[in-house]
Amino acid sequence: DEYKRRIAAAYYSKRVGQVVHRLATKSFDYAIVMRPDLLEMETLNEVLRVANKTTAYQWDGLERFPQVFEVIPLFDRFFVFDPNDAPKYKAKYPNLLACTNFYFDFPMPEVQVNPNEVMYAGAYQEGRVGSLLKMVDELQKYNLKLNVHLVLGWRSVAFEHPIITFSKKGVGFLSYLETARRAGMLLDIKACEHDGLSFRVFEALRYNKKLITDNKSVRLYDFYRPENIFVVEDGCFDGLSEFLAAPYTPLPEEIIQKYSFTNWLRYALDMPPYQVTDSKTWKFQLS
């Protein structure tokens, strides 16, 4: 898997390099690099050269891909989403800032929602499968429609399951969003290597969905409401029945807008007005 990941990263870096090379004679006010660890240094230097202000966003734990530490000092602003990384490395890397993932706030047509449907779609990762199976097994005890899909990529089908479906390729983002919006609840499985919140958390926030997650760090955020987000901790599902029966509690629009891509982009580029997107543990940034 590691070898294939490197091949994919090299291909991605090459494609980005080709685009940047065509822009070599131009200059830009800003450049934002998502997952800078995936770019080769030659490509990254090309990006940095054509922009006046540079921002990077690592939507993975820093220690999961440690090669990223080499490029942090190259950027004006370097954002991390794991609530453990900013406090841990801020002293060494002064340009390090905390933020979260986001949801895309472009308009979407209304859809018919099935409040009893629970949806999960994601890439197959060995470290997440055990937690996913436990959640699915527990949810099968209730009168729910479970829509659970794993994308295998280059892997073979790992096992058969009466609920979980598999495919080699994922669907387009808009198709995924439409499926997610039709569900009443979303599932979220934490990656073992970090405590950052996935995009699913913010999709649930944007579309007023209940969320079932095993990422307990979600409790640190201002949008957390126990009636909207059920946290599976140490494999314990106590209180799930009451959670499923309770109605969703709408959140203030100000909180919802805080986690939009529009606000995220203004924060990333330091273009006020914006709201800082952080957890309750990151308030040192505001001082």
Summary of predicted features, one role per range:
Residues 48-58:
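Short beta-strand/loop segments at the ligand-binding rim of alpha/beta enzyme cores
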Residues 1-28, 34-43, 59, 70-198, ...:
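Nucleotide-sugar donor-binding catalytic core of glycosyltransferases
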Residues 231-251:
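C-terminal "capping" alpha-helix adjacent to the active site of nucleotide-linked donor transferases
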Residues 246-263:
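A short, well-ordered alpha-helix in the C-terminal region of glycosyltransferases
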Residues 45-46, 64:
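Catalytic alpha-helical scaffold of carbohydrate-active enzymes acting on polysaccharides/glycoconjugates
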Residues 220-235:
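Nucleotide-sugar donor-binding patch of glycosyltransferase catalytic domains
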Residues 180, 204-205:
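Short alpha-helix at the nucleotide-sugar/activated-sugar donor binding site of glycosyltransferases
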